[in-house]
Amino acid sequence: MNRTSPYYCRRSVLSLLISALIYAPPGMAAFTTNVIGVVNDETVDGNQKVDERGTTNNTHIINHGQQNVHGGVSNGSLIESGGYQDIGSHNNFVGQANNTTINGGRQSIHDGGISTGTTIESGNQDVYKGGISNGTTIKGGASRVEGGSANGILIDGGSQIVKVQGHADGTTINKSGSQDVVQGSLATNTTINGGRQYVEQSTVETTTIKNGGEQRVYESRALDTTIEGGTQSLNSKSTAKNTHIYSGGTQIVDNTSTSDVIEVYSGGVLDVRGGTATNVTQHDGAILKTNTNGTTVSGTNSEGAFSIHNHVADNVLLENGGHLDINAYGSANKTIIKDKGTMSVLTNAKADATRIDNGGVMDVAGNATNTIINGGTQNINNYGIATGTNINSGTQNIKSGGKADTTIISSGSRQVVEKDGTAIGSNISAGGSLIVYTGGIAHGVNQETGSALVANTGAGTDIEGYNKLSHFTITGGEANYVVLENTGELTVVAKTSAKNTTIDTGGKLIVQKEAKTDSTRLNNGGVLEVQDGGEAKHVEQQSGGALIASTTSGTLIEGTNSYGDAFYIRNSEAKNVVLENAGSLTVVTGSRAVDTIINANGKMDVYGKDVGTVLNSAGTQTIYASATSDKANIKGGKQTVYGLATEANIESGEQIVDGGSTEKTHINGGTQTVQNYGKAINTDIVSGLQQIMANGTAEGSIINGGSQVVNEGGLAENSVLNDGGTLDVREKGSATGIQQSSQGALVATTRATRVTGTRADGVAFSIEQGAANNILLANGGVLTVESDTSSDKTQVNMGGREIVKTKATATGTTLTGGEQIVEGVANETTINDGGIQTVSANGEAIKTKINEGGTLTVNDNGKATDIVQNSGAALQTSTANGIEISGTHQYGTFSISGNLATNMLLENGGNLLVLAGTEARDSTVGKGGAMQNLGQDSATKVNSGGQYTLGRSKDEFQALARAEDLQVAGGTAIVYAGTLADASVSGATGSLSLMTPRDNVTPVKLEGAVRITDSATLTLGNGVDTTLADLTAASRGSVWLNSNNSCAGTSNCEYRVNSLLLNDGDVYLSAQTAAPATTNGIYNTLTTNELSGSGNFYLHTNVAGSRGDQLVVNNNATGNFKIFVQDTGVSPQSDDAMTLVKTGGGDASFTLGNTGGFVDLGTYEYVLKSDGNSNWNLTNDVKPNPDPIPNPKPDPKPDPKPDPNPKPDPTPDPTPTPVPEKRITPSTAAVLNMAATLPLVFDAELNSIRERLNIMKASPHNNNVWGATYNTRNNVTTDAGAGFEQTLTGMTVGIDSRNDIPEGITTLGAFMGYSHSHIGFDRGGHGSVGSYSLGGYASWEHESGFYLDGVVKLNRFKSNVAGKMSSGGAANGSYHSNGLGGHIETGMRFTDGNWNLTPYASLTGFTADNPEYHLSNGMKSKSVDTRSIYRELGATLSYNMRLGNGMEVEPWLKAAVRKEFVDDNRVKVNSDGNFVNYLSGRRGIYQAGIKASFSSTLSGHLGVGYSHSAGVESPWNAVAGVNWSF
């Protein structure tokens, strides 16, 4: 019970009162001394006995009070200071004390006693052997478990000691709490939650240490410990097993203790201080702290097994704060040091193959070999030696007395040699660095290209080695042949020197006062810094090399710059210095710099005098007060002037005159800024900008092409504003004495402080006190008339603009190509050609006069009154709320008021937008004018060049828009939504288009009388409601049905009109009549109740899909009409007729309007025929309908009497189905022609080879090269009705060899050739065949005259088809094919004197492959068979002659007959079966020629021929050849 509780206070006061008021003799108590039964709320200040028969509740035990609970029960007792409660058994009954509070008293629990839920605020609890304490909370007192048991104890600020084989289970020790487990006791399931547990000569099991808790173990055992955030220390021969160490937890093992089976997790610490730790599992991030001095550690880490034993450490991993000391005479092998890991190799210790990763540190005072540094740090301390170190990244620091031998310094790493440190044999790779401090030693250095050496020439520095150029040294205060690059740096200190230094990219050479350098090469990216009083001779500065210096007396620099010019800095003068790439020059007071060039990132500070400096892009120069700059050329750089700059030329870049002054500056593309009492005098502005800021002044500027801007507080005096220049005077700026040319642009505001000047016409102008007078605006000039100010007689020419703000007034402005924007009031403005006046919301224009080419625009809530609109003037406005317009034009008065526009004239850019709910009447839209109606209009006339739209403006559609009596007279009208009632369209340029409705809520309707005449057009989109329209198309007026994908599908798009009258008019059922026969699957049906007159209908068809446009007349049709259908190469799926026209009757006549009355539909031609039921169909039966047979006149004789015994009529014979008469199309004929051509090409080419073999007969044997050219004409007819004329020209070249054999001669040869055939189709069009051939031949000639010849030939054909359809449309295609053929011939040569007769017989065969190809009109073709086999029998008669000049000639004649056996070369066209190109039969051949030998090696021949058969006639066949023998 809490002592401060009200209940407790009441009881205490009551006890005192009773004691004071009631006299009690000594020994007499006010409580029950022997409790039998239940006693409540008593205060015990004497002895009370509670045996097994008694129970007390809420007993208060005060000083001198004692409660003995022996076998009984005590509940809720409070034991005050001096009070005592004893709990034990009696008569085998267990004594129980529940929920006792000890507040300064004592509770003792003996054998057979149990305490449950005790709270110790202060005081003590003793648990003896056999006693049990359950659930005690120790807040401030103490608990002593002496041989007894304590379970579930919470120590929260107090202490507990468990001794003499006591047992504590489930204890929780919070912060400030402690528990001592001693004298053979046992603690199990303990949680040390920030508190402390001391264990001596005892055992602890299943302990959890967290939140900074501590467990100290002496001569004891710790089993199954989990350390989550505290410390366990094993001391004095203690042992631990099965320890888990988590982040923040630590196990310390001293030199006499042992820990076995340890799991160390990330952030956990195992600290072995000379003791033993076995079966360690070191997880990633786990921390191991130990040394090699008597320590034994073994286990596994992320790299594998590791151990420390007998002063040797193998494979140890140090990270995250881990540390290993290698003690004297100890060693470590393959140690890995990661982030925050450290290792110390002490004196006389060794470490081999160490790896130092990023964040790891190794300190060496002993010996380290073969170390790899991967981002970590190795410190070589006094007496330390590192050999064979490889620095991949990271740092090796060689301290005083330390030494490193054979070090590899890789990219991104560095070796630092401090004073009295030594590096031997260091190899610096590209990107690596060797840093040698003053007094450091580095010998045998190998400096590779791209590596960095950082050093100085100070006392004691001793460096030597090789770089990419030569051997180098730094010793005795002198550096020779040093290469500096990639952060390399050499400082030449006072009284020392450097020679032959090379400074490459990233390198830097610093020459201090009284130091000297000679023969320095400064390359791109390198830096040479010569400090005041330093000396650098023979400097060779390359492009991009940076020089940092000043002109201070005593500084000496000489050399050549990057442009090859000699430069110097001496005797307080700098000449030809180039500054770039971080280079800088300071010109001190009393010195000067001449012809300096400042490139990108170069810098120059002038305190003295500067002449002729060039500032290129990104270069900077500052001219300080009292300093001067003359003739600077600024080309992209920046010059800041606090002093004086004269005759500067600014081509690009910037000059800032900040309190200084300039004279005669020339601005040609750059910027000059004058500010802070700076002054620019006589500046010439050709292009670029001069801007005058607050307290800046420009005087006498000439503005030729750039701009002068005068900002607030700035002043421009006597500026000359020439053509192309701009003078911009802003609010509170001033410009006086301006001389303005006619095209000089003045930009000003009426809030300028003061503007005065004279125009080119001599008129003075001004802006003062908010009033602008006679301002001229042109070529970009702008005057802003601000609120409560005014302008008068402003002249706004081309490119000028006047802005009249709210509450401002402009009077008498003239616009000649310029613009006036009116937000206030404009009076008596005149708008000439190109001028524009725009009246904005709440603006008002009064008495504006618009001349031809001028434009007045009135926006919403704008007002324009008393307007005069002359012919050719444009008015742009709408019927929006608030707009009020009134005026006159050539047709009378016009107005817009109350959302009604009347008698508007829109032309030459004029525009009227009629908004929804508003109206326009009697509008005229002329050339260049436009009108958009979202509301209603009537009697609108759209003349040539005018444009009218209904129901749409930009992206707004209005379904309720309506127009009545629209007259389109050469103009254009488009209906997007709404209703058009009664319209007329006339003129060749007149067009009316009704677009497909956007959706169901924005319909498009056409109703009433609509007349299209004089070549005008009416276009109807799909979905337009025309059911109430009566259309008339006359005098070549046309109606177009323009469907889109909204009605694509298997059904036609539907169009319906009430009536259709054609009077030489045209109706196009699809919009693309001139395109190939494709409609993207869209076909239209036009339905009308009545059709009359005469005219033309144009229809699309898709015969392959049995689809097409269609005309339907519900009632009678009268008149004469032509139907035009497009040709196509695609065949119908069937031969069924396609209905194009349906009528309900009448005498109308429909004929096919195509050429000849035929249309090409695939393979066959079609005609239009009536079916006798008022329908007209397309059919491939081209046979004309028979003339009708008149009914016979009735016989006047009376019918005979009926036969009393009639016999039935005999069954009539069935009427045969008529066979349609078909005719192929020209496209089909072209395909068949091409299929018949290839055998003829092969044959013509073969003839040149046969001719070659014939002229060799009986000639000497030689090796020969020969060539022949030939030309053939074939006139061909085929059974399929496809005729053509072929003209072939070709050339063949070959080589052969004739050789003697017994009783004869053999010939072997090869050839190749090319021929080209032009094929003219009888039905129109043409084709061509290009043929490449290759082959060989052989011949055997017996001495008797008998011979045998053979030829084999391969062909590659390229065929092109350029056919024509009946309408003249193209049917083009091409394909490749291959051919193979052979020829065998045998004969006998008979000779009689000079006469020779050679009868012969031959057999020839040819075949070609058959690709499928398509024509451009959709026709497809495939030759099923292309073959030729023929025999030939004939004879040749020749006569040999020798002429007087020795030349031999042999004329000859030949006659033969040929039989072609192949009669089934079939060609498949579309899907209409096979056509047979029948060229079989006999053919007569007649030839003549002559062979001549010009010399023993040169001969030639010439031949001509004629042949004829039933299908092929060759009017000529000519060949000429030449032969060279060798």
Curated annotation (Swiss-Prot):
PROSITE patterns: AUTOTRANSPORTER (PS51208). Residues 1258-1526 form the Autotransporter domain. One of its GO terms (cellular component) is cell outer membrane. Disruption phenotype: No change in cell adhesion or biofilm formation. Residues 1207-1219 have a biased composition (Pro residues). Gene3D superfamilies: 2.160.20.20, Autotransporter beta-domain. Upon overexpression shows increased adherence to polyvinyl chloride (PVC) plates, increased mature biofilm formation. This is Probable autotransporter YpjA. The gene is ypjA.
